Amino acid sequence: MLFVLSGCAGELSMLDPAGPAASSQYWVWWVLLGVSLVVAMVVFVLWFYTFWRKEVPQRTMQEERRIMLRWVLGGGVILPVVCIIGLLVFAAPTGRGMLPLPLAAGEPERIEVVGHQWWWEVRYPGEGEEPDVITANRLVMPAGEPVDFRIISADVIHAFWIPRLGGKRDMVPGRASTIRLEADEPGVFGAQCAEFCGAQHTHMLLQVEAVEREAYDAWLAERRAPPQLSPEHDQAQAAFGEHCAACHTVAGFPDTLINAAMDHAIEGPDLTDIGSRPNLGAGVLPMEEGAIAYWLQHHQTLKPGNRMPPHNHIDRETLEQIGAWLEALQP
């Protein structure tokens, strides 16, 4: 048993809870495992006893029927009903804890998460005249307080799951749902789409960072200030407007540089702060110098089937210039 459980460690393990919902699920898991083992042991003991007993007692037909009825009622009805009701009563508070119920004081932070094939869009709605903060494949949340995640899918069914904080919840196209999670303390947690959504399902990772409230507010304020476009990247910005701006957005990017002849359907990730993200392609490449240029040149090899078309018509030098500029987009 210990050998098997040793494979349950890691950042995607629910056996290392870091929040109230995950802690409740942790205990439900252990209780369910314990009850299952006890029932399995009883069944195996009775099964072995049936084969190993040396003498079979002689009974009348009526006695045999009474014994059979006891086993059917006891083992087939009473025991399952008692176990299931007990587990439901024990587990009910866990599900209730993840519902967006009114809090005793204040309002929870709200974050929107949209699942795409195969990446995550994360939105922080602004209040009043504040602009929304939009990022991708990285989720920053305040620690020590409940957060309501409004989740939806843009294409197929996905599932939002942060094992160490709780979950999971299906993301259904056209239907929004809400799940409430909380991180006990600051930390970095792994998240993964938990519903098969196509060829690159396994390459749909989300890095979750829980930070103190002050750091969270500062992070949002930095993202709401559009990045300053440096003159040293003029050629890269012109190339981005020509080839990339039909699908991707950078806050503050001048409309005059966007190729008006192209169909504009923003279907790719917002790239406003891409240089500060921990990885590319939802976990395919670590973010390091030259990584974006390499991704632009080889993305269909690194993540086959992703919706960004090949860039065979763009020379390598131009792709490297675009990559260098995008890496510089950091608050």
Spell out what each predicted region is:
Residues 21-42:
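Membrane-entry segments of alpha-helical transmembrane domains in multi-pass membrane proteins
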Residues 9-28, 51-266, 283-297, 302-304, ...:
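Non-transmembrane, membrane-proximal soluble domains of secreted or membrane proteins
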Residues 38-45, 78, 82:
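Residues within alpha-helical transmembrane segments of multi-pass membrane proteins, especially transporters
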Residues 8, 330-331:
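Short, solvent-exposed mixed-charge patches
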Residues 324-329:
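Aromatic- and Gly/Pro-enriched helix-to-coil junctions and flexible linker segments
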Residues 1-10:
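N-terminal secretory/membrane targeting signals
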Residues 40-56:
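Alpha-helical transmembrane segments
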